[in-house]
């Protein structure tokens, strides 16, 4: 009894024909035209890349353009919204996909992750502002004490006859107080470490205030009471106006520091001229220029105190700031007193 094989044996040309189930379609068998002839080859397809060493035959399909459609070809019509041009990709790659909800959608492009150091600027700004405000309050407190001492000394030397007579008879006390004032002024102006060292800076400032108050009171004792009172009132009005104006204006007076220093040299030469030429009109002109110059210095020193312009003082220099404002106000008072006194003669 013979059994037909139902599996493929190595060396067989064709699979068995009695396999159970549907059989896969077989390709048509190509017969040779005559015994011994080779099997016909399929037509050669030309290589699209034109490789050398392979024969190139004619393509079985006619080459040519696509037929023209019934609609005219052209660009797409412009939409109702203007389209923003995109720069071409230099490498011919398609543009990356952008999520409409991402922060880089549209023309906005974020360079990097948000910096948390930016949020720390606000406490620093508030901290600097608080320090500057405390510095301003301290300076005006010291200045108020200085002016109170000077005003009290001027009032005593003006309204008390015994004191007025004593200082008029003892002129040498003026030169002693001037020497003490000059030494303390040089120390506070030139020695930065000393004027920042507490409490010696306040001690030196107190010595300067007392000596200058004595000088101002002695000068005021040579004028009548009415002239002194008028000078005090005018000085108060001028200084208050200049300080308020310096706080509100946008003009930077600190940029004029060089011009003011040159003006001080010119005023000093003018003062030497007035010593040798005793003329009432010339002295009034000199006093007017001096009052105007130190009014400008008061504006500059006020803006240096505020710290909102090109130049500013360090919060550690509250003694130096008070010294500048105090000497400006005293010089304005003395020049105005000279103008009023010479005008009444």
Curated annotation (Swiss-Prot):
Subcellular location: Membrane
Disordered as annotated region, ranges: 1-115
Pfam name, any one: Bax1-I
InterPro entries hit by this protein: Bax_inhibitor_1-related (IPR006214)
Transmembrane region(s): 139-159, 171-191, 202-222, 227-247, 257-277, 281-301, 320-340
Tagged with keyword Disulfide bond: no
Entry's Gene Ontology BP terms: endoplasmic reticulum calcium ion homeostasis; negative regulation of endoplasmic reticulum stress-induced intrinsic apoptotic signaling pathway
Protein keywords: Membrane, Transmembrane, Transmembrane helix
Protein family: Belongs to the BI1 family. LFG subfamily.
Protein name, as recorded: Protein lifeguard 1
Biological source species: Mus musculus
Originating gene: Grina
């Amino acid at each position: 009894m013979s059994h037909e094989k139902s599996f493929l044996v190595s060396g067989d040309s064709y699979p068995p024909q009695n396999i159970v189930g549907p059989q896969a379609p077989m390709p048509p068998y190509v017969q040779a035209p005559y015994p011994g002839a080779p099997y016909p080859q399929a037509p050669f397809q030309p290589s699209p890349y034109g490789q050398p060493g392979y024969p190139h035959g004619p393509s079985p399909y006619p080459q040519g353009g696509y037929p023209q459609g019934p609609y005219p070809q052209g660009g797409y019509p412009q939409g109702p919204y203007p389209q923003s041009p995109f720069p071409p990709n230099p490498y011919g790659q398609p543009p990356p996909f952008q999520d409409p909800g991402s922060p880089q959608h549209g023309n906005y492009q974020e360079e990097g992750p948000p910096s948390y150091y930016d949020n720390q600027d606000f406490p620093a700004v508030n901290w600097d502002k608080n320090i500057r405000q405390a510095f301003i309050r301290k300076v005006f407190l010291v200045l108020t004490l200085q002016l109170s001492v000077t005003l009290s000394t001027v009032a005593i030397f003006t309204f008390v006859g015994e004191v007025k007579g004593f200082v008029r008879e003892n002129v040498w006390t003026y030169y002693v107080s001037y020497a003490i004032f000059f030494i303390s002024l040089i120390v506070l102006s030139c020695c930065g470490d000393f004027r920042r060292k507490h409490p010696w800076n306040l001690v030196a400032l107190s010595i300067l205030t007392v000596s200058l108050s004595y000088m101002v009171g002695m000068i005021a004792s040579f004028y009548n009471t009415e002239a002194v009172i008028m000078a005090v009132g005018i000085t108060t009005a001028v200084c208050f106006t200049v300080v308020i104006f310096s706080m509100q204006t946008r003009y930077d007076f600190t940029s004029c520091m060089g011009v003011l220093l040159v003006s001080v040299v010119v005023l000093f030469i003018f003062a030497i001229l007035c010593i040798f030429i005793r003329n009432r009109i010339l002295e009034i002109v000199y006093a007017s220029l001096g009052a105007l110059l130190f009014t400008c210095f008061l504006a500059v020193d006020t803006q240096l105190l505020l710290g909102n312009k090109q130049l500013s003082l360090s919060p550690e220099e509250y003694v130096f700031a008070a010294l500048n404002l105090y000497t400006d106000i005293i010089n304005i008072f003395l020049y105005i007193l000279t103008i009023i006194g010479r005008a009444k003669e």
